[in-house]
Structures are given as C-alpha cells and as structure tokens.
C-alpha cells in the first residue's frame, strides 16, 4: 500500500508537468504544420492541438499533421546540408574579401561563375603537370630538354662572331662536337654557311684586338658608292683644289691677318 501511495503521489506531482510538456510539444507540432502548409488557414490550430493531447476525437487533422511532419523531417537533413554549404561559401567569400580587398567584390561573381561552368576535378588538380603537357603537346618539356642545346648553340654563335677567346674555342671544338651536329640538324645547314675562311678570321682577330670589333666592317659604305656614282667624280676634282695639311700651314703663315679676322672661314 505504501508503494501505491508513493506512486500516486508521484503521478499527482508530475502530472501537470507532463501535461504541460505534452501541450507544448503538440502546440509546436501544429504550429510547424500550419507553417509548412501553403495556406495556413486550412489547418485548425486548436483542433490539431486538442487531437494531439487526446482531448478531442480524431478528425484526421492530427494524422495529416503527423504525415506532414515526417516528410519535413526527411527534407531537413538536405536543407541543413544546403544551409551549411551556403554558410561555408559566405565565410569563404568573406575571407577572400578581407584578403584581396575590393577585387573580389568586383570580379568575385565572374570567377565564381567560371568555376561553376568549368569545375576542376581533384584528379586534374593532382595531375596539373600532366594536363599541361597534354594541352601544350610537350612544348615546355621540349624547351626544358633543349636548354643545354641552346646554351651550346649560343657558344657556337659567339665563336662564329669572333667574340670568344681562343681557349674557349678550343674547348668548344673538343667538347661541343655533338652540339654542332645538333645545331646543324636543327637549323638544316643554315649555320654551316656562316663559317669563315682562316684568312678572314685572322683579319677579324686583328681588327678585334685593335678596334674592339667596332671597325670590323672593312670597305666603303654603300651610301658613299651611290654618292660617288651620282656626282661623277666632282668631289674628287674639288678635293684637288683644297690645300693639304702642309699647304694649309704655309697659307696660314702668308695671310695671318685673314686667319685672325675670319678664323679660317675664308681659307677656301
């Protein structure tokens, strides 16, 4: 009997609390159902709450609400994932705006659209070098492999132009035989025609030592030949009447006053 009395007292004490919690849960569920419906007025909130509490016979309002709540609970994980994605994107855009200032505000939408149109797969990110080689057909790889050949070809050009030393030339002839063959294969014999005879190279060496390569071009320029053809030796005959250095000295001694007066302007 004592146990029954204790149980009854506990039920009396906890009954109002349980009823309050049940009422609160029922009111929350009915409110959620009315919120989910397209027309909230179609659901009788009071009848739904009373049916949930068991105080009113079932009119299929609470059953409809339960079905709607189950469907909404199944959709909640997807909505939660989408909300997490949106929040992550917002945080990422916020960090980018902090890092790059107003640049991402102006061009961020464009870059985002490009990423959506042309997404990058993880395999492509991992194998970026292979994608570049596929896209450019091994062009960069070929340039990297031909770096030594280009260096050797530059040494060969220096040698042909006469800018290298004798020691460098000897070392190049000893060590760079393979590079010469590679250059000849690459340029199809074009560099072969630039080789000079020994006599011309000796003259070039002397000019190189004397003038530093500035006066390597020997002979009159083309414009002088055209000028000579145009005036037919007139300048040559005029040059005969001009006083030489010795005659100029005697002429200056004979007429010092004119020299002083006109400063050599009337010498001719």
Curated annotation (Swiss-Prot):
Name used for this protein in its record: Proenkephalin-A
Signal peptide: 1-24
Subcellular location: Cytoplasmic vesicle, Secretory vesicle, Chromaffin granule lumen; Secreted
InterPro entries: Opioid_neupept (IPR006024), Proenkphlin_A (IPR000703)
Chain segments carrying region Disordered: 163-184
Annotated site (Cleavage): 111-113, 133-134, 215-217, 219-220
One GO BP: sensory perception
Highest rank taxon of the organism: Eukaryota
Organism: Cavia porcellus
Keywords on record: Cleavage on pair of basic residues, Cytoplasmic vesicle, Disulfide bond, Endorphin, Neuropeptide, Opioid peptide, Phosphoprotein, Secreted, Signal
PTM comment: Proenkephalin-A is cleaved by CTSL to generate Met-enkephalin. The N-terminal domain contains 6 conserved cysteines thought to be involved in disulfide bonding and/or processing.
Keyword Signal: yes
Start-end of Basic and acidic residues biased regions: 164-176
One MF term in the entry's GO annotations: opioid peptide activity
Entry's family note: Belongs to the opioid neuropeptide precursor family.
GO CC list: axon terminus; chromaffin granule lumen; dendrite; extracellular region; neuronal cell body; plasma membrane
Modified residues (Phosphoserine): 252
Propeptide residues, chain positions: 197-208, 218-228
Disulfide bonds: 26-48, 30-52, 33-65
Keyword Phosphoprotein among UniProt keywords: yes
């Amino acid at each position: 009997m004592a146990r029954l009395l204790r149980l009854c007292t506990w039920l009396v004490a906890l009954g109002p609390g349980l009823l309050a919690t049940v009422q609160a849960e029922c009111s929350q569920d009915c409110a959620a159902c009315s919120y989910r419906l397209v027309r909230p007025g179609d659901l009788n909130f009071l009848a739904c709450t009373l049916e949930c509490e068991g105080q009113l016979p079932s009119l299929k309002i609470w059953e409809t609400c339960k079905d709607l709540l189950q469907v909404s609970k199944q959709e909640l994980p997807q909505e939660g994932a989408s909300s997490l994605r949106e929040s992550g994107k917002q945080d990422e855009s916020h960090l980018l705006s902090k890092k790059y200032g107003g640049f991402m505000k102006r061009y961020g939408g464009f870059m985002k659209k490009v990423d959506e149109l042309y997404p990058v797969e993880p395999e492509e990110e991992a194998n970026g070098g292979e994608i570049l080689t596929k896209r450019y057909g091994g062009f960069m790889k070929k340039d990297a492999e031909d770096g030594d050949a280009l260096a050797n070809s530059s040494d060969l050009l220096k040698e042909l132009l006469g800018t290298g030393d004798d020691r460098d030339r000897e070392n190049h002839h000893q060590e760079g035989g393979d590079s010469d063959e590679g250059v000849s294969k690459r340029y199809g014999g074009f560099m072969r025609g630039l080789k000079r005879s020994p006599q011309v190279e000796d003259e070039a060496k002397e000019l190189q030592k004397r003038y530093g390569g500035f006066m390597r071009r020997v002979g009159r320029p083309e414009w002088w030949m055209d000028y000579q053809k145009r005036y037919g030796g007139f300048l040559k005959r005029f040059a005969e009447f001009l006083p030489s250095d010795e005659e100029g000295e005697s002429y200056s001694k004979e007429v010092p006053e004119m020299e002083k007066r006109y400063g050599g302007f009337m010498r001719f």
